[in-house]
Amino acid sequence: MSHPKFILVSDPAAPLVGTFVYGLVDQHKDLLRAYEKVHGYQKVHGGGWYLKDDDRKTMTLYGSSGDYGEPRLAFLNRIPSELEGYTFLFTPFYGMPGNVLELDDVEWI
């Protein structure tokens, strides 16, 4: 069964610039496999789960990845352009209020 999960990855050529990868998958490593088929090898900087609310234009990130550990949010540098205009929040636990993430320096790809 698929679940809404995300990972943060970086290309070895730009190791300090992370990309937000998300989708409905069974395991976080399924996101990595699909992304690497197109973009080549990537270093993973953790991951978690997400709750996307299109009506409120929010993307709440929470939890951690069983495959890759807690998300290192300093690597949230590049986000798919279909999410531009969304407010991103992070909370360690589902159902808890989230903190708004600063996205002023994000590149929308």
Stretches found by the model and what they are:
Residues 1-109:
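Intrinsic low-complexity, intrinsically disordered or marginally ordered coil/linker segments
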